[in-house]
Amino acid sequence: MKITWLGHSAFRIETGKAKILLDPFLNHNASFAGQDINDVSSGITHILLTHGHGDHVGDTVALAKETGAVVLANADLAAWLGSKGVDRIEMGNTGGTITLGGFSATFTNALHSSAQITEDGVSHALGNANGLMLHFDDEASIFAMGDTDIFSDMGLINELHQPDIGFVPVGDRFTMGGAVAALACQRYFSFKTAIPCHFGTFPIIDQTADKFIDGMEGSKTQVKALKPAESLSI
């Protein structure tokens, strides 16, 4: 398995059976600058979305049309994507699991909102915000928390799924900050590896993952604070 952080909450995940983009906010992502969208979307089989905000949906519509990738999203967001011409969609909702050729995705809770803002400035709700629990055939498992605060049922998610790797939002203001994210990882999860995300993209969120790294000091979990475009092989 090869995991590449594309900046913000966008990741490319490559396994022997799937090539996945998670929350592909690319073209307007300052952390993505200097990377080639054609390279990172090459050969993708699936696009996975945690929720409907623009900094997570990002370039999904264009990429889905260009590549023919299957898009996974909650039911309300899936309906919106369909209205934009995306025709290969797998929809689900909190608690549901979908098998997708080489891996499965389970929608979990996340404490956040989910919406798109139209040109008139009105926010239109698009279902629940979710985390995504990804189980791969003969590979490490990943829990992409999505945008969230800490909540005690994270412990139940860990009990049910025992994820090996966590994608953890740490930027504060719109998600939990680094210190709280470290508490969440140490109290509720038994990750082998934690990868911080959702930081450094906008001036009003934390610019580094330092608070998370400091909070994880002494933990059995290995923290991998990747740079944009940096990859980790598992």
From Swiss-Prot:
Per its UniProt record, what SUPFAM superfamilies does this chain match?
Metallo-hydrolase/oxidoreductase (SSF56281)
**Superkingdom of this protein's organism:** Bacteria
Keywords (alphabetical) are: Hydrolase
**InterPro entries, sorted:** Metallo-B-lactamas, RibonucZ/Hydroxyglut_hydro, UPF0173, UPF0173_UPF0282_UlaG_hydrolase
Q: Which GO terms describe its molecular function?
A: hydrolase activity
Protein family per UniProt: Belongs to the UPF0173 family.
Write the protein's name. Answer: UPF0173 metal-dependent hydrolase RHECIAT_CH0001941
